[in-house]
């Protein structure tokens, strides 16, 4: 997302190793569920009383465990006032950068419980502690978007937690701009498109049913876009430009064997693979809007929160790049945005009542005021969006 001039500067790369998760699904901290160990204490004077009080205690514990699933609007019997429960928001890639900043902004508002969907459980736990997140305001769950099995397991684990889903934020991304040869996901897809687009596509399709069931006043599905995939901007015209072509590479499975590892079927380019994946993200958001907004009332949106020049997305670049890129964005392009500010902007798209319009690509001006931005022809092509959707369905096993 913060890639306005990334393609013009030298860099090196390496593929990060997958984090290993040691937490058991039975660990109460994984789902934010309170322990039952103290709930059955009592001094009973008769067997009948013992049974009665035991039933009362167990009922109370069940109510506490299922607290997140209570109706969105609760009415106080004493005062007759309506109060909103906390909303539940899943954020992918919430252990660093924009994802962590957004988690912090939402958790500190007191209105949201954040589900941090991350590849590395321990990294996420340390990040949450470092950010000062109160334990009652977040839950960490394992998700590796480079594995479709992991995506399905995450959805299964989330549903077992019995938490409702009110907002889904597809934020996580990988970026290997200097890669000369493609790397691949567990399912054999080129890693940038496989992670940034296909992993999120499957996650969104599966969790759509959970969003539909939400009784929250404003349920939303948000996909983080990028200015580099929007070719009607200066940054979007920095070579190599995003271009999905006729999707022959995507239709072939992006395997690099019988088909190209690039969506357009061309020669591999790591920077272009990332940009193409962000075009897919923005096309997918619009196709979700066309297919489901009127039926479900869900708000589907994308955004570019600004150039986060210090983000970990550039962690594989050489030290010189990491040193020069932030001041270049601050003083030359004037597009620099801190992680904290970008997190507030994404949190705004999550909860601001004025940003409920569906099918919109949000951006911000220099005064940090949000506005509806225009997408390029490539990123707003309805027919291409339909084709990307249909091919993606086949690749992830939904068709």
From Swiss-Prot:
Annotated SUPFAM superfamilies: NAD(P)-binding Rossmann-fold domains
Chief localisation class: plastid
Pathway per the UniProt entry: Porphyrin-containing compound metabolism; chlorophyll biosynthesis
Organelle transit peptide: 1-64
The EC number(s) this enzyme carries: 1.3.1.33
Catalytic reaction(s) noted: chlorophyllide a + NADP(+) = protochlorophyllide a + NADPH + H(+)
GO cellular component labels: chloroplast
PANTHER family found in the cross-reference section: PROTOCHLOROPHYLLIDE REDUCTASE A, CHLOROPLASTIC (PTHR44419:SF19), PROTOCHLOROPHYLLIDE REDUCTASE C, CHLOROPLASTIC (PTHR44419)
UniProt family annotation: Belongs to the short-chain dehydrogenases/reductases (SDR) family. POR subfamily.
Protein name: Protochlorophyllide reductase, chloroplastic
Species assigned in the record: Pisum sativum (Garden pea)
Taxonomic lineage of the native organism: Eukaryota, Viridiplantae, Streptophyta, Embryophyta, Tracheophyta
